[in-house]
Amino acid sequence: MVANPDERSPQPFVTACTFCEQCITLERASITGAGVLVWLPEIGQAELNHIVRAIYVARAEKNELTDTATRAMDALMTRRADAKKRLGSDDPLLLATVMQEMLTAEEAHGASTKLDGIRLLPPDKHIMRTAAGDVNQFPQILKYWRSAEGPYGQLPVEKWTEIFKAASAKIGHA
């Protein structure tokens, strides 16, 4: 990602994971179906991204954690209703539009209050537009995460269980 697309020196570039990148490009996330808004003030966006990544890895393993991971994702998905109550929608494009508007100080404060606790729940897809058409890169991303070089390659199953129990307890679905 680059802060200023006209500048091409290495300094303005930042590496971001696909989930974090989606939070920065909400308008594109909405168009590609890359996530929904949830109200989850108990945890931050980065923590949610880590939890969701663990959920997708566990679901891909097809072991005793698959059902637990599915329940954890279901619990997170129930928080869409809370986002809809607060904002009238769970579509990231709404949030992107509000953030790009020229708001008065009073309007910005009101928006900030409503948005406090709103998070982007990333889906199990990552669409890349190519000359040949749209391609879902998520299976390759998931394969890397599970590989020996990936972030979950060396993480024992016992740790995954702890992650899911902690996540479920935090959102009240223990």
Pin down the residues of each PLM region.
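Charged, amphipathic alpha-helical linkers/stalks
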Residues: 28-81
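Short Cys/His-centered divalent metal-binding micro-motifs
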Residues: 13-33
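C-terminal, charged low-complexity interaction regions
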Residues: 78-174
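Short linker/helix segments within small regulatory modules
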Residues: 1-14
